[in-house]
């Protein structure tokens, strides 16, 4: 099944699921950043976590 891009708060999310998580973070009054960083893994692949929650210094992949 192909992900459906979804816009929320002027951000185009790659999927509806990611947008729903953003809505949940807002409901919980958690500051969040969407796809803030890109990391290079040991096998030289790029990895971009979906969210960063600054309050907890936490990256989240949904």
Describe the residue ranges of each PLM region.
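A structural signal for short, well-ordered beta-strand segments and their strand-loop junctions
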Residues: 33-34, 59-61
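A short acidic/basic microdomain associated with nuclease active sites
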Residues: 28-43, 50
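Active-site beta-strand-loop-beta-strand hairpin of nuclease catalytic cores
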Residues: 44-60
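Acidic-basic catalytic patches of nuclease active cores, encompassing PD-(D/E)XK
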Residues: 1-35
């Amino acid at each position: 099944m192909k992900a459906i891009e979804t816009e929320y708060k002027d951000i185009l999310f790659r999927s509806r699921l990611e947008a729903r998580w953003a809505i949940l973070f807002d409901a919980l009054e958690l500051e969040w950043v969407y796809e803030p960083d890109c990391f290079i893994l040991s096998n030289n692949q790029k990895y971009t976590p979906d969210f960063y929650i600054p309050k907890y210094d936490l990256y989240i992949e949904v």
